[in-house]
């Protein structure tokens, strides 16, 4: 048995692991397992020798796509030993690990967004309007004179949807501006489904939804997500700057009554980290699912700087996130922290996912609508999606992450946040302390269970 490409070895918190960055699979190893796996980067190890370490290890190596078979195994060393692993006893992952026996534990495989620009496009944000009736601080899609700008026509948007579908996209998130300000929103989402794109979500600020508009999109949309500020009417609105709580609750109820799955997205910031559990209670009371977004601030935004969490607040956020995680579902968006471990070398922005602005321009993700990262215009060149590329190197090539023991768990975090905070897309994610604390607590919990 010999490793193929995309296999890495590492030892977060002194626990030996191998992972496959293409499949997301993680296997925790004993020192004996780590030693035999280390050899598989450079030699073909007999399967019987691998099984002698643990009978289930070959099963998990095949299930996770770690090994090459037959002639490919004779082509030379395809795997890449990234980090020497000095192991201890392995731990079963919280939230549903697959056991590989008493001596080794293999965490269940989860899809990891590819960083291969030749891989099919998996998902895309499609911003259908610049127009918005709110003025939230930190809005990622804010542009000058947004309400004076021309919206793309339905035919122009259909052309963009054609390009996304032809590139293999299977999930579209409709965003804005405020999508419900468009009278033809139902026509847009209907065409997405007509092009056999599997799922469509809509993001909204919740103030422009009506039962009629929801009924029109209900046959085509799987989920409508509503941005929330405070968890109750008494909390001061930090992001939206005007009291909207009751209107947002009414919007979620309308969404549910229309037969669409409601979802709420509060923004986690320095002012509400200690009240995150209240949002979970709110979501449950509304029959909605939930995750938090993380507040990101451009260098020059002094208004936002006052509510960006410091490292102490991020440590508390990590504790709250672990407490709120349910069945491995990530509580934080744009941050790979959940109770199910996965191997990743990056978030997939620019390769597995893209974002199309309300002008038809393509960017790596919805947080990177900056001309420095433009991949082209779908209005001018529908084929520009073929030139997709990541905005930054893989985590193993990032100097800021070179000595970090969790880099193949977090994938380097969010490159957009790094760029916002420092002006350098290869810099350390300003939320690094959150991820490090989260994984430390998670591993402590895992070890405590075994």
Where are these regions (language model features)?
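Short Fe-S-cluster ligation motifs
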Residues: 161-177, 427-450
């Amino acid at each position: 048995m010999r490793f193929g490409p995309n296999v890495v070895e590492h030892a977060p918190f002194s626990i030996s692991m191998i992972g496959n960055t293409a499949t997301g699979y993680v296997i925790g190893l004993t020192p004996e397992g780590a030693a035999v796996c280390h050899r598989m980067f450079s030699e073909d190890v007999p399967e019987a020798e691998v099984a002698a370490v643990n009978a289930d290890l070959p099963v998990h190596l095949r299930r996770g796509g770690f090994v090459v078979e037959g002639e490919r195994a004779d082509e030379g060393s395809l795997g890449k030993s990234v980090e020497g692993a000095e192991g201890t006893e392995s731990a079963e992952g919280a939230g549903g690990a697959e056991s590989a026996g008493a001596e080794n534990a293999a965490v269940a495989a989860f899809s990891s967004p590819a960083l291969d620009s030749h891989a099919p496009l998996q998902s895309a944000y499609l911003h259908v309007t610049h127009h918005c009736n709110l003025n939230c601080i930190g809005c990622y899609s804010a542009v000058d004179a947004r309400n004076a700008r021309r919206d793309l026509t339905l035919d122009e948007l259909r052309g963009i949807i054609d390009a996304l579908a032809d590139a293999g996209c299977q999930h579209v998130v409709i965003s804005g501006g405020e999508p419900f300000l468009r009278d033809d929103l139902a026509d847009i989402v209907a065409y997405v489904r007509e092009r056999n794109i599997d799922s469509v979500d809509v993001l909204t600020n919740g103030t422009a939804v009506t039962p009629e508009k929801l009924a029109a999109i209900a046959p085509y949309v799987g989920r409508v997500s509503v941005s929330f500020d405070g968890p109750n009417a008494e909390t001061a609105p930090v992001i939206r700057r005007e009291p909207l709580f009751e209107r947002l609750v009414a919007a979620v109820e309308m969404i549910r009554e229309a037969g669409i799955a409601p979802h709420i997205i509060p923004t986690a910031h320095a002012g509400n980290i200690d009240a995150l559990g209240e949002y979970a209670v709110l979501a449950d009371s509304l029959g909605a699912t939930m995750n938090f977004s993380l507040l990101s601030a451009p260098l020059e935004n002094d208004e936002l700087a006052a509510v960006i969490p410091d490292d102490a607040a991020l440590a508390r956020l990590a504790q709250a996130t672990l407490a709120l995680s349910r069945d491995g579902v990530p509580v934080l968006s744009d941050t790979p922290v959940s109770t199910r471990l996965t191997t990743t070398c990056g978030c997939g922005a620019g390769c597995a996912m893209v974002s199309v602005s309300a002008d038809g321009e393509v960017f790596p993700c919805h947080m990177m609508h900056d001309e420095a990262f433009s991949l082209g215009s779908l209005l001018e060149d529908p084929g520009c999606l073929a030139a997709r590329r990541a905005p930054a190197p893989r985590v193993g090539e990032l100097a800021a992450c070179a000595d970090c023991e969790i880099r193949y768990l977090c994938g380097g975090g969010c490159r957009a946040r790094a760029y916002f905070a420092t002006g350098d897309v290869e810099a350390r994610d300003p939320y690094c302390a959150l991820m490090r604390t989260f994984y430390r607590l998670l591993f402590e919990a895992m070890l405590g269970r075994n």
